[in-house]
């Protein structure tokens, strides 16, 4: 069913949790989408952007800044997820998680031992391209996306990593 939806709608970009995101629903979603991609015809292609939340990825290649105003909107929005925050108030830790992403991303994406990125909060992603039945890692043209930038600028032009 998901493969049919992909073929019918031909999305340019698909977001999904990365394979090892620990949470069983996230892992199941990853498997469902990857299985669906495998059913698409060879000419089908799109960007695949893997997200992380419960388990960090060892090799993200894209940082997206979240400015303090948007972060406050996210935290406020999460408070309406009553069942989740009643058992685990992770909305309170969201700013610290995004700060830690800046630390990790500065090293993993910017290069070990380099200067930290001049941002306070971010999310990390792994950008790949589904092409000819294969998932190929692709580094975005712009590895760090400022909060006020349009994502298509960074994702519209990608270069194939390693050749």
Regions found by a protein language model. Give the residues of each.
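Metal-dependent de-N-acetylase/amidase catalytic core
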Residues: 1-163
């Amino acid at each position: 069913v998901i493969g049919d939806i992909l073929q019918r709608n031909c999305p340019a970009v698909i977001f999904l949790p990365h394979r090892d995101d620990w949470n069983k629903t996230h892992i199941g979603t990853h498997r469902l989408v990857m299985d669906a991609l495998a059913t698409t015809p060879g000419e089908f292609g799109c960007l695949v952007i893997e997200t992380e939340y419960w388990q960090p990825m060892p090799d993200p290649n894209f940082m997206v800044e979240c400015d303090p105003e948007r972060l406050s909107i996210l935290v406020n929005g999460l408070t309406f997820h009553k069942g989740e925050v009643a058992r685990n108030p992770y909305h309170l830790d969201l700013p610290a998680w995004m700060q830690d992403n800046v630390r990790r991303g500065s090293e993993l994406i910017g290069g070990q031992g380099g200067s930290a990125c001049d941002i306070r909060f971010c999310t990390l992603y792994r950008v790949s391209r589904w092409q000819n039945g294969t998932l190929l890692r692709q580094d975005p043209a712009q590895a760090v996306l400022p909060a006020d930038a349009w994502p298509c600028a960074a994702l519209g032009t990608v270069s194939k990593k390693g050749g």
